[in-house]
Amino acid sequence: MSLVRDLRIMAAQTIGLGVGIGEVFFVVTARDTTDAYYSYLRTKYVPEGMIYTTVATAYAAAVSDRNDIIFKMPGIETVAAELDWAKNRTHLVGLGGPQQKGYESGTGLYSSTITVANVIHNTGVNNQFHNITVMNAGANATCLSAFKNAGYGTRMIGCQIIGHAAATQAATALANSLEIAEGGYYFYAEKCNFGSTDFGTLGANTAAVLVFSNTTGGAAPSDGKFVNCNFSAQINATTRCLIYSTRLGLDRDWIFDRCEFYAFAANHGYVMTQVATNEANPTTYDMVFKDCVAINCTEFRTDSNGCTWTIGPAADGKGGIAVVVT
């Protein structure tokens, strides 16, 4: 049985792409015998034409709506341009396993280029991203996101998404790790890490790990879900937040199931007032925190025109909150 066939079966059974899988592509550091992954692929009779040295060139070879899969070999690729992921049902899968905190030994994409607004900008439909790290460390106010999602039906499993990693970024309004933009309906993430306590202190009240950015009436993304995910950032003021929404940023239900929220401050010098907040006079929505914990935060939400629900163990009447007792 060939390696390509093995990976097709794995994708169908483990990742859940079904049996209608299109072409597969591989990304290595170099197409050279000194590259262990390239050499391995060639010994397994993977054709030269299926092996690429950047995710962008592999993506260019993929065909929209064919359920093509790009397999990224372990290692971080440094990019100098935004990757516009506009094709539908075109998937990116890291072969280094679920991504842990700390990008250096991960599998994915990194940018420190000051002109890269979003490392990946997904506008395609029903795309999946598995076991991938994406980091934007550009020291510029234009470097807003690591991953911007403006396509519906996106699934993200076992990924690590880190933005606002430089001081200039982190002090910019709406800077984020993950941006849910207009068109980003039906988003689903599971076992992912968003943000980091190792890079960039949030320096603006509207910068956050997760930002809902839509400004178009009637286009607010809805029906999203995060399962067993971690959201974390450094803070230097009580007014910072981990989730921020513009006035028309989201609609209907957004569910956080068994997620952790961590606002790190040295020596607990600051306690975040609320995990989530929004621009004044927002559209009505329901944000549910089911069996979640928020560390070094006072509440999930103080007040809102939308509705915030917390379900789970209570501490001082604020479900799942963990604060320093003084």
Enumerate the language-model features and the residues they cover.
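Surface-exposed or flexible loop/turn and strand-edge residues in extracellular/cell-surface modules
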Residues: 4, 12, 22, 67, ...
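Right-handed parallel beta-helix
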Residues: 93-96, 125-136, 152-165, 183-200, ...
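Surface-exposed intrinsically disordered loops and tails
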Residues: 32-44, 104-111, 274-279, 311
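N-terminal segments that cap or nucleate solenoid repeat domains
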Residues: 58-67, 322-326
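Extracellular beta-strand/beta-solenoid scaffold signature
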Residues: 80, 105-121, 137-148, 165-184, ...
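Flexible, charged surface loops at secondary-structure boundaries
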Residues: 18-22, 61-66, 84-87, 121-123, ...
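N-terminal extracellular ligand-recognition/capping segment immediately after the signal peptide
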Residues: 56, 64-116, 133-138
